[in-house]
Amino acid sequence: MTENAVNTAVTSTSSPAIPAETSAVSPATRAANRPLGTPLGKHPTRVLFLGAGELGKEVAIELMRLGAWVCAADSYAGAPAQQVAHEYRALDMANAAELQALFDEIKPDIIVPEVEAIATDVLAGTAAAGAQVVPSAEIATICMDRERLRVLAHEELGLPTTPYRFAGSLEELRAGASEVGYPCVVKPVMSSSGHGQSVVRSADAIDAAWTEAQEGRRAADEGDVSRVIVEALAPLERELTVLTVSSSAGIVTCTPIGQRQESGDYRESWQPATEPDGEAERARDIARTAVEGLVAKAQAAGETGWGVFGVELFVLTDGSILFNEVSPRPHDTGMVTMASQRLSEFALHARAI
């Protein structure tokens, strides 16, 4: 079987076209009123996963329980979600031509990005053509760009963050690091999983941090130069994740999740997190504000903004709470909800979609 072969003998059928008289209806109304169908019937709800890892696998299972037809795409065959989906594909999702060909073939009603290495221009074009991107193509683009996300969170929404500067050259990085002070953290504005990040404790290490950021950024093989963010190294006591659900019913925040990391890698999480009085509510307020801002961007672009968001927060030694980043999908620390809640983050994501 080739990498592009299907893993089950399923006949592909396109979803029925939206009648012309409903074209002016909002994306949220269309999504809420979409008949779910049955996965092997004539008119299934067709869901395409872009990324087929462990988290995607759990979401795929929940969507299939609700009656959706699922195709899981990743850069290699045999990824976890591909092993449970109705069909799978292996391709370079950052390649615009390959991704467009996949959309043309599958004709998805719903697209669920589970990774960040995606040709976002093609994703946005497909959303504009009527597909529901989860939570939205606009949100996916914002959340994979630290500069856009930080500007939204701090400068537009007024959320507390570490002091930061952006730099597009080594000289700008030197100046920015001097302004925020040492020690500081340097990250590419476009990277994931800690790639390209470094802690800089003196001006002597700035050159090495710039090189590390350029080599670790997303699409480092495409040449040019990546902008970076340099931010003060906060006196961190611990980190929290607040799962936040956006759906047709509004926005709901969940009890904060505590976590432990080693060398930047997630090791364990627990819910509820152990926090002093008032900390949970402050954390949930920050998470709600962040997601409200993102959903507003999605709706302004004509999209729903529905789904689960993992809002990452820093708790400092003085008890203050800072916004860090947002994952516009179920969060790895949220896997604990499979044991701690009646509905896991994956079930919530599927229902919100």
Please annotate each region the language model reported.
Residues 3-7, 25-36, 50-52, 289-353:
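ATP-dependent carboxylate activation and anion-phosphoryl transfer catalytic cores
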